[in-house]
Structures are given as structure tokens and as C-alpha cells.
Design a protein with these regions (language model features):
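STAS-like cytosolic regulatory interaction modules
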Residues: 1-52, 62-108
Length: 108
């Protein structure tokens, strides 16, 4: 998985690309550790994630809780269709803040 982080005064944006699974959890954790302490808003862009597993979901929940404990905002941005389906099936779409740049396509 490719991880790109950009920051400004108050916001960290982490763009993920590829598969986010157990094999990538450690590199994700290393890349984002400290962001919730440093920035008031952490955005994780999931628009280019083709696959996500339970270990990756646990990492997102862990980061969300860490941000909440610090009083920071944590947002998942533009989850791809496969990621959105998993978030909805697990109910994490109700527990995590998700924002779309454009309205999500309706599924039939």
C-alpha cells in the first residue's frame, strides 16, 4: 500500500492507495502515529483502496479513538465502493465519521 501524507497548520491528510490489510497495518501505524497529537483534524482518504480487511478496520478504529481522546477530529474521506460496503456491513459507517467530496453513488 502506498501512503502519502500532507499537512498544513491544523490538518493532516493521509492518502492511501492499494490494499489495506494485515500486511500493511504496521506501516500504516508508523505513518500516522503522532498525527492526532499534532493536528486538530486527521483525514484518511480511502478513495483508492481496493481492499480492506478486519485488521485495517481495527487500525482505523484505534486512530479514531486516539483522536477522540485528544479532542481532535478524525474523518474517513471518499471510501471506495469496496471499502464503503465493508464499513456498512460492519456498522462502522455509523461509528466513524465519513465524508464524501461528492455524493456517494446509489446502489441498487
Amino acid at each position: 500500500m502506498e501512503i502519502t501524507t500532507t499537512t498544513n497548520d491544523e490538518t493532516a491528510i493521509v492518502v492511501l492507495r492499494g490494499r489495506f490489510d494485515a500486511h500493511e497495518a504496521a506501516s500504516f501505524r508508523a505513518a500516522v502515529s503522532g498525527l492526532v497529537e499534532e493536528y486538530g483534524l486527521v483525514r484518511i482518504d480511502l478513495s483508492n483502496i481496493a481492499f480492506i480487511d478486519s485488521t485495517a478496520l481495527a487500525e482505523l478504529v484505534r486512530l479514531s479513538r486516539a483522536a477522540q481522546a485528544r479532542g481532535s477530529d478524525f474523518v474517513l474521506t471518499d471510501p471506495s465502493v469496496p471499502v464503503r460496503v465493508i464499513l456498512e456491513l460492519t456498522g462502522l459507517n455509523l461509528a466513524l465519521r465519513i465524508e464524501d467530496r461528492e455524493p456517494a453513488p446509489e446502489r441498487s
